[in-house]
């Protein structure tokens, strides 16, 4: 196992579009992790998501309880022999689409599937969020 340098962490975030976002529990119970499409813009150091939720959903309860989150993305760079993973922690804040437009453009080009069947500017069903990064780390694992 080898620690990734910041440049490699940026590469993993820039080159991928699917990760796992873990929201802090409002009751101190286990966090709420879920897969999510994301975009990262290295020029602005912006990590962005657009999330859909309803007022009575578990996701909404967790989002409104504590803004502290963890985010994880991984990739297999060489089949069955090299994997890299990145963990990011910080504060998840509601934002505007114009504030995170470069990161969302990255989301559109990197995601492996359509992240949501509605358009990004349909604010009645989706909300843009930015993860304000406090810390990140990455690891590379090699087999053989």
Regions of interest found by a model, annotated:
Residues 1-15, 120, 141-144:
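Haloarchaeal acidic low-complexity proteome signature biased toward cell-envelope/secretome components but also
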Residues 9, 56-59, 99-103:
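Amphipathic alpha-helical interface surfaces
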Residues 12-13, 62-63, 107:
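A generic structural signal for nonpolar/aromatic side chains embedded in well-ordered alpha-helices
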Residues 16-54, 71:
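Short beta-strand segments
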Residues 43, 63-65, 95-99:
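A short, structured loop/turn motif at beta-sheet edges
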Residues 51-53, 64-75, 84-93:
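Active-site-adjacent structural patch at catalytic or cofactor/ligand-binding sites
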Residues 51-57, 69-76, 107-118:
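Short acidic (Asp/Glu) patches
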Residues 80-144:
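Charged, gly/pro-rich active-site loop segments
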């Amino acid at each position: 196992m080898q620690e990734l340098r910041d440049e490699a962490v940026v590469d993993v975030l820039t080159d991928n579009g699917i990760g796992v976002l873990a929201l802090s529990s409002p009751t101190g119970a286990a966090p709420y992790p879920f897969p999510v499409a994301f975009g990262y813009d290295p020029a602005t150091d912006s990590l962005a998501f657009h999330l859909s939720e309803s007022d009575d959903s578990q996701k909404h309860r967790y989002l409104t309880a504590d803004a502290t989150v963890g985010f994880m993305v991984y990739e297999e760079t060489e089949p069955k022999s090299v994997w890299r993973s990145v963990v990011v922690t910080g504060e998840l804040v509601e934002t505007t689409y114009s504030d995170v437009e470069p990161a969302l453009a990255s989301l559109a080009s990197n995601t492996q599937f359509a992240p949501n069947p509605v358009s990004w500017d349909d604010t009645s069903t989706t909300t843009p969020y930015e993860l304000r990064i406090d810390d990140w780390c990455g690891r590379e694992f090699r087999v053989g």
